[in-house]
């Protein structure tokens, strides 16, 4: 189980990303449409003034149940350990153990 402070930090980042999503996107579109270098630099400065954690690249996928940051499956939102346990107990519909 991951530290609760790290899980809460990720939750705050998700909220910030959602809050500044449209502002960040509009500024990026303005940069594409800008004609002069001064305009681009001014808009870029506004973009840099946004909170650092509002950038979507700072988000990290974590396991929905345990908060484990590594080896997550995107389809399920679970780490490999939890996925294996849940698959063995038939809690994931449609997931079967492969054999050949």
From Swiss-Prot:
Part of the 30S ribosomal subunit. Binds 16S rRNA, required for the assembly of 30S particles. It comes from the Eukaryota. InterPro entries: Ribosomal_uS14 (IPR001209), Ribosomal_uS14_bac/plastid (IPR023036), Ribosomal_uS14_CS (IPR018271). This is Small ribosomal subunit protein uS14c. SUPFAM superfamilies: Glucocorticoid receptor-like (DNA-binding domain). One of its GO terms (biological process) is translation. Keywords: Chloroplast, Plastid, Ribonucleoprotein, Ribosomal protein, RNA-binding, rRNA-binding. Signal peptide: none annotated. GO terms for cellular component: chloroplast; small ribosomal subunit. It is found in: Plastid, Chloroplast. Belongs to the universal ribosomal protein uS14 family. One of its GO terms (molecular function) is rRNA binding. PROSITE patterns: RIBOSOMAL_S14 (PS00527). Its main location: plastid.
